[in-house]
């Protein structure tokens, strides 16, 4: 795996990597030039990457959602009419404990945090300890902006990041949304069929995926 330290364009044979802020890179791509988008944007309020104006440190959930809507308008422009978007998002809580930081061992191994605490904000509807519901806020906002919300997939994590909580279950899942810009789009159901005891041809892919988080290479 090549780690890119600076923004820029990197090529190797037919492969091309654009490295930079999505809000800067996407406008440089041709309309309708992308078949599939797989993305996990910065989760709201859970990590500071030390970049001015970064996505994820907006003052309110609404501001974060609006930024996501704006970014995905540009995603829609570059996406082919038969293309798909697979969007992974985690959640956070409104908490008085400040920003939650991942356990160093897990952070060093590149593990993703689940629904962690967010510094408490003054909000007309969010109360202390409320689960904010960021993934669904974004999904519904994109739906309202014209995207087809085709599927919600639960990413089940058998080895989630530990949480020091005693008044709720430990978070062990995140969401993955399948979004399209058209009613008809390319989706190869046969390529992802699951084994089934009662059928030699298998069964249609289910919407709960059990995948262990793995360390970065």
Specify the residue positions occupied by each region the protein language model found.
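Core catalytic lobe of class I
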Residues: 1-217
């Amino acid at each position: 795996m090549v780690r890119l330290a600076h923004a820029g364009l990197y090529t190797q044979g037919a492969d091309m990597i654009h490295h930079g802020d999505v809000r800067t890179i996407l406008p440089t791509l041709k309309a309708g030039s992308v078949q599939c988008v797989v993305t996990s944007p910065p989760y709201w309020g859970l990590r500071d990457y030390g970049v001015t104006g970064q996505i994820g440190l907006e003052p309110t959930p609404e501001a974060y959602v609006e930024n996501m809507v704006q970014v995905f308008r540009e995603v829609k422009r570059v996406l082919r009419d038969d293309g798909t978007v697979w969007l992974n998002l985690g959640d956070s809580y409104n908490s008085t404990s400040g920003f939650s930081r991942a356990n160093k061992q897990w952070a060093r191994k590149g593990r993703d945090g689940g629904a962690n605490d967010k510094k408490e904000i003054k909000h007309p509807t969010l109360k202390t300890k409320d689960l904010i519901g960021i993934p669904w806020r974004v999904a519904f906002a994109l739906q309202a902006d014209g995207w087809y919300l085709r599927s919600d997939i639960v990413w089940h994590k058998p080895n989630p990041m530990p949480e020091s909580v005693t008044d709720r279950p430990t978070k062990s899942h995140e969401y993955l949304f399948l979004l399209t810009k058209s009613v008809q789009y390319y989706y190869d159901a046969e390529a992802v069929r699951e084994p089934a005891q009662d059928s030699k041809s298998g069964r249609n892919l289910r919407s709960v995926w059990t995948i262990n988080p793995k360390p970065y290479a």
